[in-house]
Amino acid sequence: MCAGMVPSAAMAAEAEPAPVPEEELLTASSQSGREIINFNPDWRFNLGDASGAEARNYDDSDWRELDLPHDYSIEQDFTQDVDVNSGALPGGVGWYRKTFVLPADMAGKNISIEFGGVYMDSTTYVNGQLVGNYPYGYSPFAYDITDLVVADGVTENVIAVRVNNQLPSSRWYSGSGIYRNVKMVVTDPVHV
């Protein structure tokens, strides 16, 4: 399970993209016909709502760089303005974005993204298109993104995840954000 991701600030509007060096392409390990890619490294994060952040060409260059898993509640200051059952830490909205290039040999394969846990009420976009909303916080979920990504070794794909933890949301400290591992799973169109 290894990954080599292509970091990117902002994508050029209509420029012809240059080929990405082979060693910088997203790579995966194969297990029984399934390629599992660690999708935790090289995300960008913004605490608070960001209008238009789901767009493919949104400029996230001033966002914080981080690796997942991540909890943005624990990074905030304790406050008496929230219920003590939440650990006296605020929730709120946070955005995550990741830019990646898929190698051409992934074209024609099924590609899904699996989240181990996001607390809570997450909305996921790929290349500006709504993939889905998952309102729960403690169970894993996955989306098939095959028809939304480009696998040509050149094109930058973007995944954006909006997380909204409206407190109170539990009777204990819940944290906020993509707090468990994320992986990409690549399979042949016919697989077990």
Report residues per predicted region.
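N-terminal accessory segment at the very beginning of proteins
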Residues: E16, E75-S86, Y96-K98, P103
